[in-house]
From Swiss-Prot:
It is found in: Cell membrane. GO terms for molecular function: potassium channel regulator activity; voltage-gated potassium channel activity. This is Voltage-gated potassium channel regulatory subunit KCNG2. Belongs to the potassium channel family. G (TC 1.A.1.2) subfamily. Kv6.2/KCNG2 sub-subfamily. It comes from Rattus norvegicus (Rat). It is a multi-pass membrane protein. Pfam families: BTB_2, Ion_trans. CDD domains: BTB_POZ_Kv6_KCNG (cd18382). SMART domains: BTB. Residues 441-452 have a biased composition (Basic and acidic residues).
Length: 480
């Protein structure tokens, strides 16, 4: 790097005289400064900085020596009298607009968080942003904080240290992970996903058929017809496949405890376990244990009703369902606000309609305030079953107010929930596309190959004068 020309520090000298020395008129250099930010050269007047001071440039003006100057900027060109800053030129254009027009706006190009860091670097308060731009920055900060708080989704990729494993067990686990977790990895992954979805559909059909009146009548009489036996065989085959799939997913997981704590693994356990519990209970009771089965019949039926959770397994293969689950996790605060709004409105309109109908109108539909809570919830959600209808004029006025307030209260958090769903869907779709794109396999000898190729390329370029001349003509940073 070119050094500054020597300027002895004179007591009482003007601040920045060591920086503004050199060829040319001293008065012109005292009035202007040339700033180069990432290739964007701007000539600024010190008077503009006085109107809207930048902390870093003010420190630059007060510099008196070379070492002090390098603590403020990244480089200094003596021939051009130019100060170089290795920062974002896009963000600096917005700062130049602030100096010239007095308005600071958030540009569409750079990231809002990166722009905030640039403002902190140049010493500009975020409050100088225009109101609309400041709202955009705050919203982006909330999204970033929310993304940091949300645990990352487990994908099919492994850590780099695991990916470099050369053992046969690690390679087999990697292939198994691609098959069961990444349907886009190949033909085996697609077939596994299709078979899993098909078994979920068959289980849903079998669950519907098992609730038919004739099948229920046979179960209550203790009989087992051909239809009942076929449904049992169908359920057994499906549960066997789901158990096999659960075993494969647990084998490919790096941490078994972390895998068992995932929501989909908990759903699998709750859906599979009732079948084995009822089967073991039937085998333990034997042919003479009918009374014990009768006492445990209600519990077993409730456990077998958990088979409906098999439908939630579709979330493994549906991008929309996974986006919905991520949205529910991220919008817990919005759902809490919605519940709070409904509870407050319900506590307000239920006593009013009870007073209007029971006390003033003498109608018996609204027998108590707790019974009126049901009517308030149904009315505010615009469902309207019609089982409880206000018939007096005051009651109808209360009903109209309840319906209108319900429409407004439901609409408040919906916009935020919709935007969160759109963002979650875009993130998961991008993650799925990255997982589907082929990645190069890392090998142990890749480092040696790269170093060999780099050495050969260096030798070739040193022997070829044209290549060396072209390389020497490339611009580079100013060095000391």
């Amino acid at each position: 790097m070119a050094r500054l020309p020597g300027h002895p520090e004179v007591p009482g000298a003007e601040p920045g005289s060591a920086v503004r020395g050199g060829r040319g008129g001293r008065g012109a250099r005292a009035r202007h400064v040339i700033i180069n930010v990432g290739g964007c050269r701007v000539r600024l007047a010190w008077a503009a900085l006085a109107r809207c001071p930048l902390a870093r440039l003010e420190r630059l003006r007060a510099c008196r020596g070379h070492d002090e100057l390098l603590r403020v900027c990244d480089d200094y060109d003596v021939s051009r009298d130019e100060f170089f800053f290795d920062r974002s030129p896009c963000a600096f254009r917005a700062i130049v607009a602030l100096l010239r027009a007095g308005k600071l706006r958030l540009l569409r190009g750079p990231c809002a968080l990166a722009f905030r860091d640039e403002l902190a670097y140049w010493g500009i308060d975020e409050a100088r942003l225009e109101r609309c731009c400041l709202r955009r920055l705050r919203r982006r900060e909330e999204e970033a904080a929310e993304a940091r708080a949300t645990p990352p989704a487990r994908g099919p990729q492994t850590s780099p240290g695991r990916a470099l494993g050369s053992g046969r067990l690690e390679r087999g686990r990697r292939r198994l992970r691609d098959v069961v977790e990444n349907p886009h990895s190949g033909l085996a992954g697609k077939l596994f996903a299709y078979v899993s979805v098909a078994f979920v559909a068959v289980t849903a059909v079998g669950l519907c058929l098992s609730t038919m009146p004739d099948v229920r009548a046979e179960e209550e009489r203790g009989e087992c017809s051909t239809k009942c036996r076929n449904l049992f065989v169908l359920e057994t085959v499906c549960v066997a496949w789901f158990s096999f799939e659960f075993l494969l997913r647990s084998l490919q997981a790096e941490s078994k405890c972390a895998f068992l704590r995932t929501p989909l693994a908990i759903i699998d356990i709750l859906a599979i376990l009732p079948f084995y519990v009822s089967l073991l209970a039937g085998l333990a009771a034997g042919p003479t244990g009918s009374k014990m089965l009768e006492r445990a019949g209600l519990v077993l039926r409730l456990l077998r009703a958990l088979r409906v959770l098999y439908v939630m397994r579709l979330a493994r293969h549906s991008l929309g369902l996974r986006s919905l689950g991520l949205t529910v996790r991220r919008c817990a605060r919005e759902f809490g606000l919605l519940l709070l709004f409904l509870c407050v409105a319900m506590a307000l309109f239920a006593p009013l309609v009870h007073l209007a109908e029971r006390e003033l109108g003498a109608h018996r539909d609204f027998s108590s305030v707790p019974a009126s809570y049901w009517w308030a919830v149904i009315s505010m959600t615009t469902v309207g079953y019609g089982d409880m209808v206000p018939r007096s004029l005051p009651g109808q006025v209360v009903a109209l107010s309840s319906i209108l307030s319900g429409i407004l209260l439901m609409a408040f958090p919906v916009t935020s929930i919709f935007h969160t769903f759109s963002r979650s869907y875009s993130e998961l779709k991008e993650q799925q596309q990255r997982a589907a794109s082929p990645e190069p396999v890392l090998r142990e000898d890749s480092t040696r190959d790269d170093s060999t190729r780099s050495a050969s390329a260096t030798e070739d370029s040193s022997q070829d004068p044209e290549t060396a001349g072209a390389a020497g003509s490339l611009p580079g940073p100013v060095g000391p």
